[in-house]
Amino acid sequence: MHSDAVLRLHNTQEGRCFILGNGPSLLKQVDELAALKDEATFCCNSFGRWKEAPFSPTYYGLTDMHDVEMMNPYIFPHLDMMRFQVGWEEDEHHKEFHWVDKAHGESQVHSNGLVGFGDELPSLPTGRTSPLTLMQIAIWMGYREFYFLGIEQTRGYVNEPDAVMSTTGRMEFPLDKNPKYQIAIQRSFERARKDLESHGGTLIDCTPGGLLNETGQDFYRRGIQWRNILEYKSLADVIKQEVRV
């Protein structure tokens, strides 16, 4: 069961939220990222290891419970943030994190759709990548305008751009050696965009060379069928535009 603190967050926020993966494209956006200090931001997993991050995130979510180190808030330079732990009920609950239930079995965004729009919050289906899974918490909080960054899925991390192995130790970079995984992510984002638009929301990608937008067309090989799933906007242009409430 979700923690009471999570349930109390329902529809307490509005406007836009920037959700960050940990792709090394963030290193090319450092100047623009500094402007996010005045925005609602949701980061995840190994982001806390990027000590040069130019802003302190509003929210932090952890979905990879194998890495106990990530659960220690005191390794992060960004201590003043709300933390969420997404997992199965039988997983160990960390006292520094608000607990959010994850659905068991084959419950996935691409087949079951997003949750968080109604007055009850079901267990979260997986988005096949942490940022999309965590977006459902932001939907529950009331955000409807979303901008994604660092969604590449082809190489290392912002804190370790030359990494040859994923944090989980289960996947070798570049992840385009695993096209089924990337295709599952594409399908999940396509369903998420449609669900969000049906509720009056927007889903935009600000990842240069990303998996989900037109700028990534020349980046993907080895069996990946590139698909332009999300509209692309540069982060600089998004920062300039007026917030839609």
Task: For each feature predicted by the language model, list its residue ranges.
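Metal-ion/cofactor- or nucleotide/acyl-coenzyme-handling active-site neighborhoods
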Residues: 1-245
